[in-house]
Amino acid sequence: MLGNFSYSNPTKLYFGEESLCSLNEELPKYGKTVQLIYGGGSIKKNGIYNQVMRLLKDNGKVVVEDGGVMPNPTVEKLREGVQIARENHVDFLLAVGGGSCCDYAKALSVSVHCDEDPWEKYYIRFEEPDCEIIPVGCVLTMVGTGSEMNGGAVITNHDQKLKIGHVFGDAVMPKFAILNPKFTFTLPKKQMVAGIYDIFNHICEQYFSGEDDNTSDYISEALMKSVIHSSRIAIQNPEDYEARSNIMWAATWALNTLVSRGKSTDWMVHMLGQAVGAYTDATHGMTLSAVSLPYYRYIMPYGLSKFCRFAVNVWEVNPAGKADEQVAREGLSCMEVWMKELGLTMNLHELGATEEMLHGIANGTIIMEGGYKVLNHDEVLEILKNSL
């Protein structure tokens, strides 16, 4: 049965082709100086930068630019952003980009007025903020992370070979998020499919736990089927508005905490993927796709009934006359076919990982509870070897 829970989400969402105009409604609520956060500069090529800047100026904002946010934003970049914000007495953080920009903005929001080293406080000791928090807004140009409607912020420390996420509370979540599916049309295919798999895996991580018949899992199955269907259209026609809008909307619901209500969750694929990312700096979604199937095939016997349900309800495997294990394996085989159809990375070797790295990656993998099997170090290492 569903466990006891409460649910709220403070982020206001604006969705659709005209959603950027909603900045006119939101910007007057916040202070004068805005730190504009973006990535490698693609928003300057596709015109989004000019649109955002015009709206900021129209609303009388002083804009301080903070570009160059990399995938898997680093602690060094975070410290650089803190310095920019402090020197300019920033009142508001506006992230224009994908999940890395949104994550960075949230990490920045709790670091600017923090007297301690944010890496140590939030990512090593996992403490909550006790300082002033700068409000954040997001204009999404790449989908996958769901960062626009949650409190998660992942930061990478290359010196320590660690990539760690901290899920902050409501006060850190974006005050608003603007989602225009057309802003995702110009993404390179690799980024698009990596984002699609990130969405799918977010749902899986919350789905593969518990055996109860609950509404949260039915919602997850519907979201997974929507992602599978729309992804097949999007890889053939990246400018299909209906497909891209459904993918964008599914990404938000996959990680705004809705589908985890009343149940435990299993985030081990993300823990493995983040540890891989700390060593390879590979695209996040591709680190997940490289380790997913070896992980799920390893834990399948411990959660056999849910894997059977996944096969039947999501992949439409016919269970008639088949043993449960066969049905479950067919479901994962269907998933593998779809992943290859998208062109996802299917092993760690493709990401540049070597056998010599595996012990370090295993040591950097945080062990999570909540799934069907709490792994030990040797099991983590075995799964990584099977992923190579």
Show the residue positions of the predicted features.
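A glycine/threonine-rich phosphate-anchoring loop and its flanking beta-alpha core
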Residues: 11, 114-212, 309
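C-terminal charged capping/lid subdomain of soluble metabolic enzymes
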Residues: 171, 314, 318-388
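ATP/NTP phosphate-donor binding region
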Residues: 1-92, 348
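Short alpha-helical scaffolding segments that buttress acidic/His motifs in well-ordered protein cores
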Residues: 200-204, 244-255, 292, 335, ...
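Active-site segments that bind and position negatively charged phosphate/pyrophosphate groups
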Residues: 206-333
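Glycine/serine-rich anion-binding loops at beta->alpha junctions
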Residues: 90-106, 141-147, 279
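Short Gly/Thr/Asp-enriched flexible loops that form oxyanion-binding sites at enzyme active sites
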Residues: 79-82, 101-115, 149-152
